Swiss-Prot record:
MF terms (GO), sorted A to Z: [isocitrate dehydrogenase (NADP+)] kinase activity; AMP binding; ATP binding; phosphoprotein phosphatase activity; protein serine/threonine kinase activity
GO biological process, one term: tricarboxylic acid cycle
Catalytic activity: L-seryl-[isocitrate dehydrogenase] + ATP = O-phospho-L-seryl-[isocitrate dehydrogenase] + ADP + H(+)
Protein name: Isocitrate dehydrogenase kinase/phosphatase
Amino acid sequence: MPRGLELLIAQTILQGFDAQYGRFLEVTSGAQQRFEQADWHAVQQAMKNRIHLYDHHVGLVVEQLRCITNGQSTDAEFLLRVKEHYTRLLPDYPRFEIAESFFNSVYCRLFDHRSLTPERLFIFSSQPERRFRTIPRPLAKDFHPDHGWESLLMRVISDLPLRLHWQNKSRDIHYIIRHLTETLGPENLSKSHLQVANELFYRNKAAWLVGKLITPSGTLPFLLPIHQTDDGELFIDTCLTTTAEASIVFGFARSYFMVYAPLPAALVEWLREILPGKTTAELYMAIGCQKHAKTESYREYLVYLQGCNEQFIEAPGIRGMVMLVFTLPGFDRVFKVIKDKFAPQKEMSAAHVRACYQLVKEHDRVGRMADTQEFENFVLEKRHISPALMELLLQEAAEKITDLGEQIVIRHLYIERRMVPLNIWLEQVEGQQLRDAIEEYGNAIRQLAAANIFPGDMLFKNFGVTRHGRVVFYDYDEICYMTEVNFRDIPPPRYPEDELASEPWYSVSPGDVFPEEFRHWLCADPRIGPLFEEMHADLFRADYWRALQNRIREGHVEDVYAYRRRQRFSVRYGEMLF
């Protein structure tokens, strides 16, 4: 290779990332217009388009590099010099951290995810940690109650860029003040002030004002979801001020926010104070930088591995028929490998399973489907693998494993947030906790269905419980769109003997689903059956599912709330007039 080519390649990669992030910001900047026009289908399409941008631009850069090098192979020294030149371009670069991830992605595409070493890749960042502790321009604006909280909130709302008419601004402000007074008390509230992010966070059918409530005793989240009435008027649906509530809003089972972030590291650093339980990976994920979130997730895994003496074990729960799932006992993630062969009743291919996981990545997850990171050629030290798990890996996924002596390489796997399997949770709880779990499960099914997702396999073992008690779906191999399913009533038996026969007395075609049968799987436990009949009996009726299908086909997009119905101002305070 001619000398000087290394710098050209480094510059080409960085320019490619510039182009990618420019398009990322362009798609994001359209969020306000889509919200104001109530174009909810365009919201969904923009989300999918933005997810695809990264891989598309990686592909463009790879083609450029193949032209530059005329397809010639490169030696190790050449690659090290390319990375060295690239590193020198980053100290003054505003999106250095994602630029490093982009470099990694280009390298992996060029070399088929092989030789992934710290010398060749940015396994850890080359730049100082938390470089944006001080930021080049303010991300937020402070508001003080010099003339009272009503005046303060009027200024906050008047500063918003939204151009639609407000339904009742005075009412919403009084709702917020009432909530803050109940939360803090009048004296503490008078000594508190707000810091509000300059940019709104858009997702689904809401625009979120995100801020910090700075009180004498500490800083709290301050989140206002702004919605539209059917007449296109704005209203504030609630006010959330606890870290638990904020954590759910920014949760791993939700779609990514559309928020204009030319300095993503600075925004992540700003958010960290009101989301202390979120990892760096989860914060990047929440603002839509999912590929860099994957980098950060891998770094978090490496840091944990270096500081523990644990071995990987099979994950607790009922063993899956499609996926082999393992974990580290103290780590909050699970690792999922597609088995070489599936159970006979699972008539599908590995390609189908991967397509299902990609569908979930691109779809609105409505807070009910766990996000995943996909890895290729994932290296594990054998000393970190328990003998029982090693035996299981070789038994169930040998075709995906390469033995390197002291290491193994798993050709393909997913990493996902670890949860307590719902079937295990239900065995361990009683009383109100049991009731809450069944209510959550039914709500999860309803919200998935309203978002045009049918889980396929609705058994409790395919759902997990988060640390906030939310029920989330995580087994995607039978997932499909609601509109692809034929929901049928079971025909009445022709003769009394029909009900005793081993075979059904009616025809069953692919895609047929009989909701009446759900009762047999979900209500067998006498503790659970009555709760189901009380709260979710309509899930056992085919006409319920068909009605949802009709709404989806008519183009209706349901509202998705990242909080309980009882927290909505309209429920808490009613239509109080001010």
